[in-house]
Amino acid sequence: MSYKRLINCCVLTFFVLTAVAQSGSNSPYTRYGYGQLSDQSFGNSKAMGGIAYGLRNGLQVNAANPASYSAVDSLTFLFDAGMTLQNANFKENGIKTNAKNSTLDYIAMQFRLFEGLGMSAGFLPYSTVGYNMSKSKQIGTDPYGNNIQALESYYGDGGLQQVFVGLGYNVFKNLSVGANISYLYG
């Protein structure tokens, strides 16, 4: 029985490592600006349609509502991670392309510092960039009348990542305040 668990853990680890290595986007629109902005919500709020600001539960990490950090119990340490699998189909001039992407959505932890004071820290992707396009165009003719073609290639991969730390404090019953500090890099 223990060998079966070990094999399952190795297989799952392989999938997670593969997921982190992917760009997460195949959209030509990510060429402009910051790229495609990532969904900043965690699994519990995604399951309820993206709602996050009104959730305050001591058993869930909610970076969108830092005041909710104060609800964590003194004996609780929360660790949360999530990933997304995405399938996209593109069609241009009769050419069909299928792209499968997997991304690490977030890693976060939450714990209680003192009575009424909770803390959370984690990592969230802010945006993703992933495109690989090329086009050929005529740039002139040679002395024999043949067209001269040039191939323009555009490639981009990466995005912005966000590391955050936040505190939430329960001022009095039914009133909590909180704030996050974030650092963007990429």
Question: For the regions a protein language model found, what residue spans apply to each?
Answer:
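Bacterial Sec-dependent N-terminal signal peptides
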Residues: 1-26
